[in-house]
């Protein structure tokens, strides 16, 4: 079966491609990407005004399985992902129970293999129960397919524990995905600290609560030779720190929420 997608804005950074082109798909595989394809096809779609890309990857999602299915589950979450052009999702470990062992990783992957509309990858916890007290079974989880590790929703407060995690994870070449905000500085804040928070009377979160956490994580990453990924960056100071870390050759990546 042949499918022809006409006049879409084809965008693929890996191929340095950003142009209005046609795509010919035959038996589920891309056969040609070019301007003005005239070959006959069983199905023809006019993608004028639309963007056509490889499947997007969302590295920070919450499928909420196991234990929190009232909020979301693998079926509903991956249906929403696929509808938005996302073909691979990585689900965070702050579930009930926390994804802190190999058997839970295997269970999620098995569940996803049976019922999902997108590829599902699993992020394991850095610490047992996300309590920040003892390292989780990161090695075992990596062998079972975990693509990274995070205490998502929690700052790894102990610098020693984080250092041990960073040194250990280099053996498995996986990123530590970090909720980088110092909770003592953030206190009970609900929004960025500034003129707006003061005017409307909502407790603000000072930007240094993020900046200090990001700086610590980058310094430890440099020391350990680990890859750290800073989640939901929200301050200019954190961006500046990440840029400087990259210039120094530290393996740091980052994301913002959309």
What are these regions (language model features)?
Residues 1-39:
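N-terminal metal-binding scaffold of metallo-dependent hydrolase/deaminase domains
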Residues 8, 23, 28, 49, ...:
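Divalent metal-coordination and catalytic microenvironments
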Residues 37-52:
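Active-site metal-binding motif and surrounding structural segment of the metallo-beta-lactamase
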Residues 50-115:
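Metal-associated gating/positioning segment near the N- to mid-region
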Residues 59-72, 95, 121-134, 201-207:
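Active-site mouth loops of central-metabolism enzymes
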Residues 66, 92, 123-125, 152, ...:
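Structural motif
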Residues 70-78, 130-140, 216:
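Short, acidic/polar
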């Amino acid at each position: 079966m042949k499918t022809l997608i006409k006049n879409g804005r084809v965008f693929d950074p890996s191929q340095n491609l950003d142009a209005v082109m046609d795509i010919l798909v035959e038996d589920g595989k891309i056969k040609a990407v070019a301007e003005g394809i005239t070959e006959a096809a069983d199905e023809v779609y006019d993608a004028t005004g639309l963007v056509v890309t490889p499947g997007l990857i969302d590295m920070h999602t919450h499928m909420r399985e196991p234990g929190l299915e009232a909020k979301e589950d693998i079926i509903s979450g991956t249906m929403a992902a696929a509808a938005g052009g996302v073909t691979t999702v990585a689900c965070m470990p702050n579930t009930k129970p926390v994804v802190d062992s190999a058997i839970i990783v295997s269970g999620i992957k098995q569940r996803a293999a049976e019922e999902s509309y997108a590829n599902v990858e699993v992020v394991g916890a850095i610490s047992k129960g996300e309590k920040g007290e003892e390292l989780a079974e990161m090695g075992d989880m990596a062998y079972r397919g975990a693509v990274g590790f995070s205490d998502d929703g929690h700052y790894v407060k102990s610098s020693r524990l984080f250092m041990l995690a960073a040194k250990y994870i280099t053996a498995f070449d996986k990123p530590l995905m970090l909720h980088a905000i110092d909770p003592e500085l953030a206190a009970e804040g609900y929004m960025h600290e500034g003129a707006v928070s003061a005017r409307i009377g909502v407790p603000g979160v000072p930007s240094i609560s993020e900046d200090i956490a990001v700086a610590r994580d980058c310094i430890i990453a440099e020391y350990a030779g680990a890859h750290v990924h800073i989640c939901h960056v929200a301050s200019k100071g954190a961006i500046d720190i990440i840029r400087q870390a990259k210039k120094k050759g530290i393996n740091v990546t980052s994301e913002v929420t959309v």
